[in-house]
């Protein structure tokens, strides 16, 4: 089971349970996440939902890279994966109950987009948040390009999404990215505090307040997400994606300058970069599976 679901005392808890890959998102996990949030929405005994991950390393690190490698040879299959991701994000964002993100570890790429889909976010003080799309070959358009500027402002959103530097929890709190940051030992108590406060509210008015607050999020999402899915599908087998995946697997930096220069010519970028054997394999097809999944999962956008 990749997603655990419990209900107790009016609170539903949805927990991503793939710690071996830093709670990364594959299709079965996305389907389970969607279904559990729909279940919580329809359950009148539930007044608040907590979304979290197993372990202390990661809340969620976005797309499962083993699945993403397969799209190099079958880029049209990415459309189906992204559809599952969209459904999951919409189930979280559109939940009829307030959703509290309990950030037990790093939130990276699509993992941060799950965080952004929640209503409130509480993080342990050793957590980092990050997007790496332009660094590693993925467009961060599953919520980040749509919503980051609403939380932290346009300039800071550009800093996060273009520079791809890790942001410490306290800095994220100062920017308005998070609601509360506490020592790890106090994380559950802080989440409990929010949940108890939310349970002492009228359910219909709370739901309507969420809908009204989501106006700008819904507007930017509905105007961009379908085109983002098409763009990501068309480019799922591209040189940049292949090089990003290969550099992850081989634990080496991308030669961005050589990549940029080669893409300005009429030759395939891979020939100009002179990749290693492993990188060339990634460009020509899915690279071999890695036994070091946690490392490859640490930074990747949806």
Model-derived features with residue positions:
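Conserved CoA-thioester-binding segment of acyl-CoA-metabolizing enzymes
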Residues: 1-52, 90, 269-283, 296-302
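Crotonase-fold acyl-CoA enzyme core
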Residues: 3, 90-204, 238, 242-246, ...
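Terminal peptide-recognition signature
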Residues: 14, 18, 33, 51, ...
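C-terminal long alpha-helix characteristic of the crotonase
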Residues: 19, 122-127, 178-226, 234-239, ...
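Glycine- (often His-adjacent) and acidic-residue-rich active-site loop
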Residues: 53-91, 107, 135-137, 220
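Short alpha-helical scaffolding segments that buttress acidic/His motifs in well-ordered protein cores
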Residues: 160-164, 209-212, 232, 248
């Amino acid at each position: 089971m990749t997603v655990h679901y419990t209900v107790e005392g009016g609170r539903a808890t949805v927990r991503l349970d793939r710690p071996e890959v830093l709670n990364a998102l594959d299709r079965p996990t996305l389907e389970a996440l969607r279904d559990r949030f729909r279940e919580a929405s329809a359950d009148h005994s539930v007044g608040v939902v907590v979304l979290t991950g197993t372990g202390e390393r990661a809340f969620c690190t976005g797309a499962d890279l083993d699945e993403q490698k397969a799209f190099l040879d079958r880029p049209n299959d990415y459309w189906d994966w992204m559809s599952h991701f969209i459904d999951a994000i919409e189930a979280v964002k559109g939940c009829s109950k307030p959703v509290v993100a309990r950030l037990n570890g790093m939130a990276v790429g699509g993992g941060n987009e799950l965080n952004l889909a929640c209503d409130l976010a509480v993080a342990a003080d050793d957590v980092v948040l990050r997007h790496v799309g332009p660094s590693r070959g993925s467009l961060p358009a599953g919520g980040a390009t749509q919503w980051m500027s609403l939380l932290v402002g346009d300039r800071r959103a550009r800093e996060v999404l273009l520079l791809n530097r890790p942001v410490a929890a306290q800095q994220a709190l100062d920017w308005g990215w998070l609601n509360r940051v506490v020592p790890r030992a106090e994380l559950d108590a802080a989440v409990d505090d929010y949940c108890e406060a939310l349970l002492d509210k009228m359910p219909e008015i709370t739901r309507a307040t969420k809908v009204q607050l989501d106006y700008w999020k819904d507007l930017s999402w509905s105007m961009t997400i379908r085109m983002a899915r098409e763009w990501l599908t068309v480019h799922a087998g591209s040189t940049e994606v292949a090089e990003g995946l290969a550099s992850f697997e081989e634990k080496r930096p991308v030669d961005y300058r050589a990549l940029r220069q080669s893409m300005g010519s009429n030759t395939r970028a891979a020939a100009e970069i002179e990749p290693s054997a492993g990188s060339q394999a990634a460009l020509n097809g899915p690279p071999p599976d890695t036994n070091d999944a946690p490392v490859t999962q640490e930074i990747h956008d949806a």
